[in-house]
């Protein structure tokens, strides 16, 4: 794989803003901590407002800084919506696979995302907490069907066990890079409406069922 972690002294070729969205307590902050710092805190408190972390990596010999934004899922923090989505070239829709309601809310979150972000933003559906297989409330097939219908990537993860977390982030970042490098555009190119135009006209391919794991475990790209 050509994805390697970059040197902080390297020139940054691209900055990709990726947002994490979904209900509270689905593990967005834990996913971010696992990817950015390889940490997991059992006592993680609910995010208040907005925070972001960065990680530098190398894709196809280019240095990419991933700027991952995390926000609280509670309704009272929704005032940050416009600024939160502005400039995002990727998004992760996160639900808790042990809580059906968090998955049922994905359509609402996706609608909000598409209402504020570029219409061709790269989106991945994430079913988190797949380490709790005995408590599964969302069959993998339901999530795959939703992802297929909405043209999203899909992966099941465990921030606790670090299952598929790095793979999920690298998949979405590599797809963003592939699109941008193909179009020879920079990450801050805006159209007349102030939306990133990097991803327009791009078809997103989700992982095939052959690449997915069994229903009882964590599903994702191999």
From Swiss-Prot:
Keyword rRNA processing among UniProt keywords: no
Membrane topology: Lipid-anchor
SMART domains: ARF (SM00177), RAB (SM00175), RAN (SM00176), RAS (SM00173), RHO (SM00174)
KO phenotype (gene knockout): Defects in pollen tube growth and altered deposition of cell wall components.
Function (record text): Intracellular vesicle trafficking and protein transport. Plays an important role in the regulation of pollen tube tip growth.
Similarity-based family: Belongs to the small GTPase superfamily. Rab family.
Protein name per UniProt: Ras-related protein RABA4d
Protein's organism: Arabidopsis thaliana
Encoding gene per record: RABA4D
